Amino acid sequence: MVPGKFIFTATFVLLCTIIAVVLEYQSKKDKPVLDKEKLQEFPLVAKTVLTHNTAIYRFGLPKSTQVLGLPIGQHISVQANINGKDILRSYTPTSLDSDAVGHFELLIKSYEKGNISKHFAQLNIGDKIKVRGPKGFYHYQPNMNEEIGMIAGGTGIAPMYQIMKSIFANDSDKTKVSLVYGNQTEEDILLKKELDAFVERKPDQFKVYYLLDKAPEAWTGGVGYITVDTMKERLPAPAEGVQLLVCGPPPMVSSIKRNAVTLGYEKAKPISKMGDQIFVF
């Protein structure tokens, strides 16, 4: 064989081999676990108690290398059989695919008269829940807004925390975030350590203001309901590149919608869409 032809043939074979290896690797990469149509079971692998009725529940994925596959800002449906009836509820994981490989986490507050939430409190390690998704009309993208105002009540902090964590972890995302977070008591404030860390490490980008219904004497935050004045003082004014996100108990959400219109925001639609100036989870 002519030396030149040999070199060409060897190079061609090597190139084909490399391409074959790359294609095989790509085909074997773990795909996101979530399925919009199919319910799948995931076992409880850890439980971190935050308050007397709230905990972070960690569920394992089939393989330690897999991710849930949840777009930031969306949620999942959880199904449980309660008294012979299959009941579905929506929850936003507090974990991101980027920091939760092999598992996902849910922040759940259990109520005595709740259905699914009470079911969570009774789970033991190894017990399974049924999940499908993703669901929702919100899909956060870096720098999609210049500023985001957030209002959360109770466990309504979950989608806000997920988005804030994504922004915090991405140095190229310059979105500014102002959060007003209401609770009944100081003990009820969830993920406070994590929220305060965002502010401490990136004070020019993150601002958090806490309100309590029942504040202790030494409390330095806000007291009472989230009023028009509170929103005007603590959140960005309505403008191009500004979006307001809301998640919490229905009475709070209704009040916030009215207050927002008073401040000049567009009226919230019955079903929120991605580009709305006010998006209600």
Swiss-Prot record:
Please name the pathway: Protein modification; peptidyl-diphthamide biosynthesis
Q: Where does FAD bind?
A: 121-136, 147-179
Cofactor list: FAD
Q: Which residues form a coiled coil?
A: none
CDD domains under this entry? cyt_b5_reduct_like (cd06183)
Q: What's an example Gene Ontology biological process for this entry?
A: tRNA wobble base 5-methoxycarbonylmethyl-2-thiouridinylation
Keywords of the record: FAD, Flavoprotein, Membrane, Mitochondrion, Mitochondrion outer membrane, NAD, Oxidoreductase, Transferase, Transmembrane, Transmembrane helix
Q: Which domain of life is it from?
A: Eukaryota
Entry's Gene Ontology molecular function annotations? cytochrome-b5 reductase activity, acting on NAD(P)H; NADH dehydrogenase activity; transferase activity
Q: What is its EC number?
A: 1.6.2.2
Q: List where in the cell it is found.
A: Mitochondrion outer membrane
Membrane topology listed for this record: Single-pass membrane protein
SUPFAM superfamilies documented for this protein:
Ferredoxin reductase-like, C-terminal NADP-linked domain, Riboflavin synthase domain-like
Membrane-crossing residue ranges in chain numbering: 2-22
Its recorded reaction(s) are: 2 Fe(III)-[cytochrome b5] + NADH = 2 Fe(II)-[cytochrome b5] + NAD(+) + H(+); 2 Fe(3+)-[Dph3] + NADH = 2 Fe(2+)-[Dph3] + NAD(+) + H(+)
Q: What is its main location?
A: mitochondrion
Principal EC category: oxidoreductase
CC terms in the record's Gene Ontology section: endoplasmic reticulum; mitochondrial outer membrane; plasma membrane
Q: Domain FAD-binding FR-type, which positions? A: 37-141
Q: Subunit structure, briefly?
A: Monomer. Component of the 2-(3-amino-3-carboxypropyl)histidine synthase complex composed of DPH1, DPH2, DPH3 and a NADH-dependent reductase, predominantly CBR1.
Which family would the database say this protein is a member of? Belongs to the flavoprotein pyridine nucleotide cytochrome reductase family.
Function of the molecule: NADH-dependent reductase for DPH3 and cytochrome b5. Required for the first step of diphthamide biosynthesis, a post-translational modification of histidine which occurs in elongation factor 2. DPH1 and DPH2 transfer a 3-amino-3-carboxypropyl (ACP) group from S-adenosyl-L-methionine (SAM) to a histidine residue, the reaction is assisted by a reduction system comprising DPH3 and a NADH-dependent reductase, predominantly CBR1. By reducing DPH3, also involved in the formation of the tRNA wobble base modification mcm5s 2U (5-methoxycarbonylmethyl-2-thiouridine), mediated by the elongator complex.
| Name the UniProt record assigns to this protein | NADH-cytochrome b5 reductase 1
Gene source species = Kluyveromyces lactis (strain ATCC 8585 / CBS 2359 / DSM 70799 / NBRC 1267 / NRRL Y-1140 / WM37) (Yeast)
Top-down, what is the taxonomic lineage of the species of origin?
Answer: Eukaryota, Fungi, Dikarya, Ascomycota, Saccharomycotina
Give the gene symbol: CBR1
